[in-house]
Amino acid sequence: MRYLYGDTSIWNRLCDQDADPNELCSALALRDLGFAIGYNVLYEMAKSFFTGTEQVTERGRKLLNYMKHYLSLHVPIVKENWALLVEEALDVTGTAKMESCFRNSSQYEDVIKEIDKLLRGEIAREVVEFFAGRKSLVRTSRDALKDQLDARPGVKTILGSASEEAIADLLRTDIIVGRTMLLGHLRREFPKNSPESLAVVAKLLLQSPKYRASRAMTRADLYLAWRCATRGSIRADLPDDTFHVVSASYCDVFVTTEADQADIALHAVEGIETLVFNQDENISDGLLNSIQTGSAVQSGL
């Protein structure tokens, strides 16, 4: 089966259009396709409960109740990006075999339990701390990207002078800059390991197309670095958008209503197809028609 990854904008539209989960999933299955739900999608819906605005909270409640229909159909949930990176690193070093990019049954049930707690208004302190930490991570990622470029003027010059066609070629190449960026992610997840040993892991991960999350993470960082170098900065929510793209790294089609999001996916995830819908399009019909005819589909680099 091939998997579709819809970003949060797609699930919002499906909810507002009252798309029937059973009918849609059945129709996709006839085409050997199925949804994969990104953990980042659920995160963005759940954070509505932490705004302090009742209207936004109600919106989050509506969305999560809608998503529960898909969870009752056992639509797979992609593991968090950090978990994918850890499992790929353990696999490439022969420490532990990577079983799946999807949450197992126990982890799946944990998600459902946490959603039910939110819907009942049960919000534990550690949950609040998690959302605060995630917001800080996005801000740190954006600042770290700019700091990395400022610390490497040579790299900044190379990226800043590269055309869009040239950056596409750069993303296909296992270069030291990419390994350095991946090393930063690995050091965060394996703080007790030496930078030297993790540098070897980064090199191994980027040498094999098997490790799709590591490669997507690196390519996304390089692409954002290029945009930062050519434009001087990147918009505040762009690093958060890349969480979706990396989450889709083991999927076959990335679906969104945002052209810029699709552009990032095409640059970051090798071989992925993208579908971009207008805000007023019927998503269910559009999905089935586009996939059946192959229209409006672009393939990754």
Predicted regions and their residues:
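Conserved residues at the C-terminal ends of beta-strands
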Residues: 257
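Active-site-proximal, substrate-binding regions of enzyme catalytic domains
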Residues: 2-250, 260-301
